Structure formats: structure tokens, C-alpha cells
């Protein structure tokens, strides 16, 4: 799989159907938590990843495996049925993209944006709160922030929200200065 987190058309349709069902049954937050948990399990387990990706397993085997994982993890019945349906229809390869699409739909429904914050060193709780407040006031939406440390930016901060990048890193400032000096 090239990028299993990108939703295919089929994955998008499965996500949309599940999203509508969760709204109808008032289970949005619970099902979203289940799917995020499954995404983390797949990221951590090569065996689970192999089950989803390998053509050596039949659709029926994949459905049984995912249903067993859902039962063991205590997922909602709706989540378990969704996983079984996707796998039994031969779409296990679209599952991670469907999860990504579902999480995005849920965030949009709740008025939340996902922001990735990159800094040269770890942020304190107060700094993180300040970044969260700044992003919220700039975009008018509640941010869900994930942080990453990248010493190569030297200092400052980079904030990515969707396709927008706010780059206030020392590395980018130095690169701009270097470019300006070369042109002079």
C-alpha cells in the first residue's frame, strides 16, 4: 500500500456511511475512540498490519480477525459490525483510509481542526496552551494539537493546520536570509 491513510473513494463512502450511523445512534465519540484505538493497534502490530494488507488472507479470515480484535478490545457493536463489513466486502485495504476520513468528518462536525506543532525542543504545558489559544483565535475553531520535536529547525515553531503551514522557525529565517544574500 502506497499511503494507506489516504481515503480511497470506497474508503470515503464507508466512512460517510459509518459517520451517518453514529450520528443517528448518538455514538460518534465512542466509535471515533474505537477507530483511533484500532489505528494505534495497527501502527504497533506488524501482524495486524499484515492481516489487513496481505492477499494471502481471505476476506472471511480478515473479517474474523478484525471481529476478534474488536471483541477483545471491547469496541462498540457498531464499530465491530463496521470492521466485519469492510473486511468481508474485500475492502480491508481501504480500512485505514476510511478511519482517517471518519476522524476528519468527526472533527469537522465538532468544529475542531487538527494542528501539528513542530518545535526544536519539547513544549511546556503553558507554551502548549499558548499555542492552542493562538491557533484557536487565528482560525476560529478549537484545535486538536499533536506535537513533534525536530531539532533541525533550530528554534521557533512550525504549525501545520490542514494544507496551511505557519513557519516561524529559525531554520526558515536563516534560509531566507541565505537566499537574500545570494541574490545580492
Swiss-Prot record:
Its main location: membrane. InterPro entries: ATP_synth_OSCP/delta_N_sf, ATPase_OSCP/dsu. Keywords: ATP synthesis, Cell inner membrane, Cell membrane, CF(1), Hydrogen ion transport, Ion transport, Membrane, Transport. It is found in: Cell inner membrane. It holds the Pfam family OSCP. The keyword rRNA-binding does not apply. Belongs to the ATPase delta chain family. One of its GO terms (cellular component) is plasma membrane. It is a peripheral membrane protein. This is ATP synthase subunit delta.
Amino acid at each position: 500500500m502506497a499511503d494507506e491513510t489516504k481515503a480511497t473513494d470506497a474508503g470515503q463512502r464507508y466512512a460517510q456511511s459509518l459517520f451517518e450511523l453514529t450520528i443517528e445512534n448518538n455514538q460518534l465519540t465512542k466509535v471515533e475512540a474505537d477507530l483511533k484505538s484500532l489505528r494505534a493497534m495497527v501502527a504497533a502490530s506488524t501482524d495486524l498490519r499484515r492481516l489487513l494488507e496481505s492477499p494471502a488472507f481471505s476476506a472471511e479470515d480478515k473479517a474474523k480477525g478484525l471481529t476478534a480484535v474488536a471483541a477483545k478490545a471491547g469496541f462498540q457493536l457498531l464499530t465491530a459490525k463496521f470492521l466485519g463489513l469492510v473486511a468481508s466486502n474485500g475492502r480491508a485495504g481501504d480500512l485505514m483510509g476510511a478511519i482517517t476520513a471518519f476522524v476528519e468528518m468527526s472533527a469537522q462536525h465538532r468544529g475542531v481542526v487538527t494542528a501539528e506543532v513542530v518545535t526544536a525542543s519539547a513544549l511546556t504545558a503553558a507554551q502548549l496552551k499558548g499555542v492552542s489559544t493562538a491557533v484557536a483565535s487565528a482560525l476560529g475553531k478549537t484545535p486538536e494539537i499533536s506535537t513533534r520535536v525536530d531539532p533541525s529547525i533550530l528554534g521557533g515553531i512550525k504549525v501545520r493546520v490542514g494544507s496551511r503551514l505557519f513557519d516561524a522557525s529559525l531554520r526558515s529565517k536563516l534560509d531566507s536570509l541565505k537566499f537574500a544574500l545570494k541574490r545580492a
